[in-house]
Amino acid sequence: MAASAFAGAVRAASGILRPLNILASSTYRNCVKNASLISALSTGRFSHIQTPVVSSTPRLPTSERNLTCGHTSVILNRVAPVLPSVLKLPVRSLTYFSARKGKRKTVKAVIYRFLRLHCGLWVRRKAGYKKKLWKKTPARKKRLREFVFCNKTQSKLLDKMTTSFWKRRNWYVDDPYQKYHDRTNLKV
């Protein structure tokens, strides 16, 4: 049972651990074969025969209850500290920075394509609103021209890609987004 859980955990990891998966599965198969052989030989019929069981794995446990092999537990103990670092997703705390001083820099494509409201939401056009317009119906073109909000993950990434200059409040004359900069009717 533990060996199958181990094999599942190794399969869930990336291709880095693939050689360990092959080793663990072959070791587990050898252990199961040897354990079934020991249980067959330990019956009353063969009690008078004293022949050692030949095994490809050294020091096979003789207990019938213990079906896990020694090598599997050793591999599990060696790989267990490595698994969290392998399975952890990479995090980019800062997306763009200067080479000389390491200061944050703004990705200009974000400034051109998105609008940040003062409440922290980002506004964008729908994807593909300028592409292949000849094959799209007028209704579909109208839907694509609409503005939509970015989700939480996108907003966090866009905040990392811009400096504090772009997060300050701006008071433009006749700003069409003036009524959207502050959130209202929020239950906190």
Swiss-Prot record:
Q: Which GO terms describe its cellular component?
A: mitochondrial large ribosomal subunit
List, in alphabetical order, the GO biological process terms annotated in this UniProt record. Answer: translation
Q: Does the keyword Translocase apply?
A: no
Q: Where in the cell is it found?
A: Mitochondrion
Q: Which SUPFAM superfamilies match?
A: L35p-like
Per its UniProt record, what Pfam families does this chain match?
Ribosomal_L35p (PF01632)
Highest taxon of the source? Eukaryota
Query: Mind listing the UniProt keywords for this protein, alphabetically?
Result: Mitochondrion, Ribonucleoprotein, Ribosomal protein, Transit peptide
Q: Which segment of the chain is annotated as a signal peptide?
A: none
Membrane spanning stretches: none
Q: Which InterPro entries match?
A: Ribosomal_bL35-like (IPR021137), Ribosomal_bL35_sf (IPR037229), Ribosomal_bL35m (IPR019338)
Is Zinc one of the keywords UniProt gives this record?
no
Q: Which GO terms describe its molecular function?
A: structural constituent of ribosome
Per the similarity annotation, which family is this? Answer: Belongs to the bacterial ribosomal protein bL35 family.
Q: What is this protein called?
A: Large ribosomal subunit protein bL35m
Task: Look up and give the organism this protein is from.
Answer: Pongo abelii
- Name of the gene encoding the protein in the UniProt record: MRPL35
